[in-house]
Swiss-Prot record:
It comes from Clostridium beijerinckii (strain ATCC 51743 / NCIMB 8052) (Clostridium acetobutylicum). One of its GO terms (biological process) is base-excision repair, AP site formation via deaminated base removal. Its main location: cytoplasm. PANTHER family: URACIL-DNA GLYCOSYLASE (PTHR11264:SF0). GO terms for cellular component: cytoplasm. This is Uracil-DNA glycosylase. One of its GO terms (molecular function) is uracil DNA N-glycosylase activity. InterPro entries: UDG_fam1, Ura-DNA_Glyclase_AS, Uracil-DNA_glycosylase-like, Uracil-DNA_glycosylase-like_sf. The active site is at D65 (proton acceptor).
Length: 225
């Protein structure tokens, strides 16, 4: 795993792989992958970083932990592979996107188009046991993703941090650079979306901020496939 980062993230995160917490996390993960069903596939663990290089990040959408159903998680928060049914949280994201910007609700949940435009789709924890949400909480991933947020905080180019739910909001303390914008709300899960996610307009707020800082807005429309 220590040489898994193939792009410019390597320059910022390579030293993490030598730290005690990560060595312990790696041992834990080797045992978990060998003895249980773990999502995502181990080769997809760092897809968020691979699909969105450090120098391209304009927006961060921070999730909790990966989807824990068969075939769903592929390393991007909230996204599922083509052919997999769109999960309820993402359906709610699409509903808000429709209300906010008029985007139609697509027939798939594959968010690679966002990642390719500079939207880092990161979970606070990058692995999960099948059928057990939060089963890899407090095993070391939080420390790793804290570091991701810290190095992004140092960027001179303004970034929008979209924090949905308490796990994501807990990262607020690491975002201290006044150039960046933080957008917070409850999680888009059906359990909480009606308590402040719907109507929060995160997508138009993000694009307005990007335009105001002379950056290209995001084309949020995921097309049918």
């Amino acid at each position: 795993m220590s040489d898994i980062l193939k792009n410019d993230w390597k320059n910022y995160l390579q030293s993490e792989f030598q730290k005690d917490y990560y060595i312990n996390l790696r041992k834990f993960l080797i045992n978990e992958y060998n003895s249980k069903t773990i999502y995502p596939n181990m080769y997809d663990l760092f897809n968020a970083l691979h699909f969105t290089p450090y120098n391209k990040v304009k927006v961060v959408i921070l999730g909790q932990d990966p989807y824990h159903g068969p075939g769903q998680a592929h390393g991007l928060s909230f996204s599922v592979n083509p052919g997999v049914k769109t999960p309820p949280s993402l359906i709610n994201i699409y509903k808000e996107l429709h209300t906010d910007l008029g985007c139609y609700i697509p027939n798939n949940g594959y968010l690679r188009k966002w990642a390719d435009q500079g939207v880092l789709l990161l979970n606070t924890v990058l692995t999960v046991r099948a059928g057990e949400a939060n089963s890899h909480k407090n095993k070391g991933w939080e420390e790793f993703t804290n570091e991701v947020i810290k190095v992004l905080n140092k960027k001179e180019t303004p970034i929008v941090f979209i924090l949905w739910g308490n796990n994501a909001i807990s990262k607020t303390d690491f975002i201290t650079n006044p150039k960046h914008l933080i957008i917070k709300s409850v999680h888009p899960s059906p359990l909480s979306a009606s308590r402040g996610f719907f109507g929060s307009k995160p997508f138009s707020k993000t694009n307005n901020f990007l335009i105001s800082t002379n950056q290209e807005p995001i084309d949020w429309q995921i097309e049918n496939i």
